Amino acid sequence: MASSKTFFLLFALLFALALLVSTEAAASEESTKTGSVEGVKDAVCHHGCCRWFHHRCVRCCRSAEEVSVSDTENNAAADAHCRHGCCRWFHGRCIRCCPSA
């Protein structure tokens, strides 16, 4: 009776350890994939992205001045959409309007 309990506890401990190791390996692999994708996105445009379509850059800015003009246009569009301006941007789009000025 005692040996079956010991065997069960040993089996449960080994199963939990294997599950923990596989979870850690999957998490580190996922972070590696995410890091490499972000690096690739940053390497696409030297001066930043001036036109986004479906969360992807479709046109790179030719110069740093063009980036500031593009940001100004985005702010104007967001101000027209949001009563108190845009508080949060994501990929060139306003995703959260400010609650008050």
From Swiss-Prot:
| Statement: the UniProt record of this protein carries the keyword Ribosomal protein | no
Q: Name one GO biological process term.
A: regulation of cell cycle
Spans of the sequence repeats are 42-64, 79-101
Q: Where is this region: 2 X approximate repeats?
A: 42-101
Keyword Iron in record: no
Keyword set, alphabetical order: Cell cycle, Cell division, Growth arrest, Repeat
Q: Which family is it part of? A: Belongs to the GRP family.
Job of this protein: May be involved in the control of the cell cycle at the G1/S start transition.
- The protein's name is CYC02 protein
What organism does this protein naturally occur in? Answer: Catharanthus roseus
